[in-house]
């Protein structure tokens, strides 16, 4: 009922500039953990900046079920097993998180991506 006082609803707003990134590949890749894994959700969400020239071999996620990647800006080459996919802004891919995979930025600008790693 709109006339009664509303109950407190859960809302958690995050800003990238307030999150310290995990830096890898000599500073060519930055991972920002936006929402860490919790058993209640069964997933975690990251924002990633892949610098030009970066070739990042990702760890396989033995406990992960599906990895979802959404390209926000730039272009990235995603290798999953023996398959290679060219993704650009607006493209998304989902794959078995336990598969060997890597991310390559052959472009001249940053590739910005969102990752969702599902464990359910």
Model region roles, listed by residue range:
Residues 81-97:
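Short acidic-glycine-tyrosine-enriched beta hairpin
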Residues 55-56, 67, 74-79, 92-93, ...:
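Short beta-strand segments in beta-sandwich/barrel cores
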Residues 27-30, 41, 88, 97-120:
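Ligand-binding loop in jelly-roll beta-barrel domains
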Residues 57-62, 104-106:
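Short histidine-centered beta-strand/loop micro-motifs
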Residues 1-13:
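Short C-terminal boundary/hinge segments that cap the last helix of small helical domains
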Residues 47-50, 61-78:
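Short, conserved beta-strand element in jelly-roll/cupin
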Residues 21-54, 58, 116-120:
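A short glycine-rich, His/Asp/Glu-containing loop-to-beta-strand
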């Amino acid at each position: 009922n709109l006339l009664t006082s509303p109950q407190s609803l859960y809302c958690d707003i995050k800003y990238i500039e307030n999150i310290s990134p995990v830096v890898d590949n000599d500073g060519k890749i930055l991972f920002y953990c936006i929402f860490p894994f919790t058993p209640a959700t069964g997933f975690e969400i990251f924002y990633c900046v892949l610098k030009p020239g970066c070739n990042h071999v990702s760890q396989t996620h033995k406990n992960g079920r599906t990895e979802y990647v959404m390209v926000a800006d730039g272009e990235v080459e995603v290798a999953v097993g023996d398959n290679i996919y060219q993704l650009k802004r607006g493209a998304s891919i989902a794959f078995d998180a336990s598969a060997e995979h890597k991310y390559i930025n052959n472009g001249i600008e940053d590739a910005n991506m969102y990752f969702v790693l599902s464990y359910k």
